């Protein structure tokens, strides 16, 4: 009888623990949206909260390319379209509502430089050609930028193959970014972590 009672108590405790875990999981699921590619979606408010804990790195793909569109070019044919510039500006306004303090680094292409310029409404920027080359060395390059920025938040304008590489390497997911899509990372103790996909709003 005693053994049966002990087993019953243990089972009740197990069920209570299991029920508690399910409640926590349900709560987390209701608070965080997920992209179809398996990446958590991070909006401006969530990004701002993360930035209070660690320096954040937001990597954007450039705006609409002129040489792959029938839309009007902003200027140079290797740059972005007028529509792309306007989209970048609107995105920059939404972004700055939650993150005002950041350093800006585009790769050394006309399309990324124009995208960064319109995104930030003319904020000073530093071109970094290493943001064009994506592979295992990209993390060291990002950490170098963080050190230059004295661990401030940084925004990088780069290319689709860079974002695809990071998503696959860090989380094992396929990410095929559209124009101005972005990934969010944070730095902690010298390491970079991929938090998810930035979703304005």
UniProtKB/Swiss-Prot annotation:
Family membership noted in the UniProt record: Belongs to the phosphoglycerate mutase family. Ais subfamily.
Annotated source species: Salmonella paratyphi C (strain RKS4594)
Keywords attached to this entry: Hydrolase, Periplasm, Signal
Alphabetized InterPro entries for the sequence: His_PPase_superfam (IPR029033), LipoPS_heptP_Pase (IPR011310)
Top EC class, one word: hydrolase
GO terms classed as biological process: lipopolysaccharide metabolic process
Gene Ontology molecular function, alphabetical: phosphatase activity
Signal peptide location: 1-35
Gene: ais
EC number: 3.1.3.-
Pathway: Bacterial outer membrane biogenesis; lipopolysaccharide metabolism
Function: Catalyzes the dephosphorylation of heptose(II) of the outer membrane lipopolysaccharide core.
Organism phylogeny: Bacteria, Pseudomonadati, Pseudomonadota, Gammaproteobacteria, Enterobacterales
Name of this protein: Lipopolysaccharide core heptose(II)-phosphate phosphatase
Superkingdom, taxonomy of origin: Bacteria
SUPFAM superfamilies: Phosphoglycerate mutase-like
Localization annotation: Periplasm
GO cellular component: periplasmic space
């Amino acid at each position: 009888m005693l053994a049966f009672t002990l087993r019953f108590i243990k089972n009740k405790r197990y069920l209570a623990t299991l029920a508690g875990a399910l409640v926590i999981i349900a709560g987390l699921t209701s608070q965080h949206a997920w992209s179809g590619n398996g990446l958590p979606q991070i909006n401006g408010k969530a990004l701002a909260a993360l930035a209070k804990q660690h320096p954040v790195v937001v990597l954007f793909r450039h705006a609409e390319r002129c040489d792959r569109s029938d839309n009007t070019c902003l200027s140079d044919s290797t740059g972005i379209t007028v529509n792309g510039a306007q989209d970048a500006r609107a995105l920059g306004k939404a972004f700055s509502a939650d993150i005002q303090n950041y350093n800006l680094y585009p790769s050394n292409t006309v399309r990324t430089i124009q995208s960064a310029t319109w995104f930030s409404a003319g904020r000073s920027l530093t071109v970094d050609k290493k943001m064009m080359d994506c592979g295992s060395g990209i993390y060291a390059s990002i950490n170098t930028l963080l050190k230059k920025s004295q661990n401030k938040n940084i925004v990088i304008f780069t290319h689709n193959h860079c974002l695809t590489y990071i998503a696959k390497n860090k989380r094992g997911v396929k990410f095929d970014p559209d124009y101005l899509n972005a990934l969010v990372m944070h730095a902690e103790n010298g390491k970079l972590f991929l938090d998810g996909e930035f979703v304005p709003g």
